From Swiss-Prot:
One of its GO terms (biological process) is defense response. Belongs to the MLP family. This is MLP-like protein 168. It comes from the Eukaryota. InterPro entries: Bet_v_I/MLP, MLP-like_ligand-binding, START-like_dom_sf.
Length: 151
């Protein structure tokens, strides 16, 4: 199968640094969004390259788990890249990686969160990931609201 890619930009009111730093501390995500029930550190250190995390999520109303490894972090670019190791996504996709980059919004306050998903479907019957993009949009918006309420 051929590798494919989808992405989405989400405008938020929080600063890029604040959103990025919160996102690096994955253990706090369940406080900010109803889509994350928890995130356990299985190997390594929180927010460090090579760390392996077990995400407990609600996607399309269904409980899901995803075992991910942090592959790259760029502090200057406010970027984190994860690779999915185990879970439902690995049952449908040979390759699945996700990258989040947070940039200050040009010409205004706030920021833009860009999610990029790269994947290779196991066969033609497996759906493309456009529906999963909405999950990321909703998570970003809920985390933004949480960060704004925290001051």
């Amino acid at each position: 199968m051929v590798e494919a890619e989808v992405e989405v930009d989400v405008e938020i009111k929080s600063t890029a640094d604040k959103f990025f730093m919160f996102s690096r501390r994955s253990q706090h995500a369940s406080k900010a969004t109803r889509y994350v029930q928890g995130c356990d550190l299985l190997e390594g250190e929180w927010g460090e390259v090579g760390s392996i995390l077990l995400w407990k999520l609600t996607v399309d109303g269904e409980p899901k788990v995803s075992k991910d490894m942090i592959e790259a972090i760029d502090m200057k670019m406010n970027m984190i890249q994860w690779r999915v190791l185990e879970g439902p996504l690995k049952e449908e996709y040979n390759i699945f990686s996700k990258t989040m980059k947070v940039s200050p919004k040009q010409g205004g306050s706030g920021s833009v969160v860009k999610w990029n998903l790269k994947y290779e479907r196991i066969d033609e019957k497996v759906a493309h990931l456009e529906r999963l993009l909405q999950f990321f949009v909703e998570c970003v918006n809920e985390i933004d609201q949480y960060l704004l309420s925290e001051g």
